[in-house]
Design a protein with these regions (language model features):
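Bacterial N-terminal signal peptides
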Residues: 9-20
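Glycine-centered signal
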Residues: 2, 20-21
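Feature for soluble, non-membrane regions of globular proteins
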Residues: 24-231
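Bacterial N-terminal signal peptides that target proteins for export
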Residues: 1-11
């Protein structure tokens, strides 16, 4: 990608955020926290580039957080955990749905990636994946298809049912499977952001290449811990 093209694309990214106090953290109610990124911007190279990570975390995620704080300020939603709000999302303002989802989804996303990621899940999670999908390779193929075929912007998810079995789904925009508006509800244990801002600087329109690269940074111990906690 040329420097000129990068400059144009970054400009488009910035224009699309449309957040006040851009890149500056807003005061937050007790239940909301903008957590530090758990690794350096360049830590996931060469699979996810540093420039994308910096823009994604410092501008996009920060923007969702700032707008969420403003959306709940002075309402009965202020101070309540997002997971509680998600159960009645169909009754709440669109600004809470978009920015609450954006903040929660990205907080999970950063944690389920690691510079020491990749490989295969072990233990109970590995067994659950095999039981639910037949094999790890079959799971990867199904998840990759969900991510690659999600039209427009959205997320692909690995989720847990109440009985401990796993399923794959995708959601549009910043929705997630905890929301009562989701086509299929469950507990997400990891997700992949397939908005263009997550990959376009490096992969352009090759979303499939981005999805394939993602497997090299999946933090399986973190995903396993989330699975165990949800049981």
């Amino acid at each position: 990608m040329t420097n000129k093209f990068k400059a144009v694309w970054i400009g488009c990214l910035g224009a699309g955020l449309a957040v006040a106090a851009f890149g500056q953290e807003a005061p937050a109610p007790a239940a909301l926290e903008f957590e530090p990124l758990p690794y350096a911007f360049d830590a996931l190279e060469p699979y996810i580039d540093a420039q994308t990570m910096e823009i994604h975390y410092s501008r996009h995620h920060q923007g969702y957080f700032n707008n969420l704080v403003k959306a709940v300020a002075g309402t009965d939603m202020e101070g309540k955990p997002l997971e509680d709000l998600f159960t009645r999302m169909s009754q709440l303002p669109v600004s809470v749905r978009n920015n609450g989802g954006g903040h929660w989804n990205h907080t999970l996303f950063w944690k389920v990636m690691s510079p020491d990621g990749g490989g295969m899940p072990e233990g109970e999670l590995g067994e659950a994946i095999e039981a639910s999908f037949g094999s790890f390779d079959a799971f990867k193929a199904q998840f990759g298809a969900a991510a690659a075929t999600r039209f427009g912007s959205g997320w692909a998810w690995l989720c847990m049912n109440a009985d401990g079995s796993l399923f794959i789904t995708s959601t549009p925009n910043q929705d997630n499977p905890l929301m009562d508006v989701a086509d299929r509800q469950g507990t997400p244990i990891f997700g992949l952001d397939v908005w263009e801002h997550a990959y376009y600087l490096k992969y352009q329109n090759q979303r499939g290449s981005y999805v394939e690269a993602f497997w090299n940074v999946v933090n399986w111990p973190e995903v396993a811990a989330r699975y165990a906690a949800a049981l």
